Amino acid sequence: MKIDLNADLGEGCGDDAALLGLVSSANIACGWHAGDADTMRRTVLLALEKGVAIGAHPGFPDRENFGRSEMRLPMEAARAGLLYQLGALDAIVRAEGGALRHVKPHGALYNQAAREPELAAVLARAIRDFNPALRAVGLAGGCFIDACRAEGLEVWQEGFADRGYRADGSLVPRGLPGALLQDDSAMLAQAEDMALRQTVAAVNGLRIPARVDTLCLHGDGEHALRFARLLRERLEALGVEICAD
């Protein structure tokens, strides 16, 4: 059995270099919600040094709220914004001798694409038009996954060890009770359920399907690096191979 571990990096928080030693995929901020040309290049170089798969982590143009505020962009603007961010990171990756492997939207863009079919379709089409070989990463069971499949893209469904789930498979919004798991044992158990049993317990107690290919390790929490080590050790002890292939 194998699974990918991914982390959102180049966002100016957390120890990116240390996390890159624990994950198999890196989602690099493309300058809109966080990051700039310098942080993109530095993170790309670190990822190449560690042999970690490089992906784009595009978001809304919302630095003030770290890309976590919902926005209602015209669909053409959403397409143009995604292409702009993909192009910026791709240019740096290629210039440094690497290859862009995947795309994972950030924050509100991620969540809206998971539940809004029109936005999901626009993003999926833009990714296909930019590079049909790119893998799309999104919330397991969400609209974005369906839209990317419809465009012929390879998809990876993502799960979260540190986020609460609603019974419909969506994430509990940040700021609401149950949105964030804090206890190491609870987070490890949730990750193990998703990786080995393809299920997750929703906040109402209902066990729901969670067919995931990759688990996200958030790098901005107080104990993020320590938990990342714990999770990797637990999965490897259970015989799970950590890889991006």
From Swiss-Prot:
Catalytic activity entry: 5-oxo-L-proline + ATP + 2 H2O = L-glutamate + ADP + phosphate + H(+)
Domain of life of the organism encoding this protein: Bacteria
UniProtKB keywords: ATP-binding, Hydrolase, Nucleotide-binding
Single Gene Ontology MF annotation: ATP binding
Keyword ATP-binding appears in the UniProt entry: yes
GO biological process: carbohydrate metabolic process
Group of enzyme by EC: hydrolase
Coiled-coil zones: none
Keyword check for Nucleotide-binding: yes
EC numbers: 3.5.2.9
Classification via InterPro entries: Glyco_hydro/deAcase_b/a-brl (IPR011330), LamB/YcsF/PxpA-like (IPR005501)
Pfam families hit by this protein: LamB_YcsF
Quaternary structure (record): Forms a complex composed of PxpA, PxpB and PxpC.
Family, as annotated: Belongs to the LamB/PxpA family.
Record-linked PANTHER family: 5-OXOPROLINASE SUBUNIT A, UNCHARACTERIZED PROTEIN YBGL-RELATED
Role description: Catalyzes the cleavage of 5-oxoproline to form L-glutamate coupled to the hydrolysis of ATP to ADP and inorganic phosphate.
Protein name: 5-oxoprolinase subunit A
Organism of derivation: Chromobacterium violaceum (strain ATCC 12472 / DSM 30191 / JCM 1249 / CCUG 213 / NBRC 12614 / NCIMB 9131 / NCTC 9757 / MK)
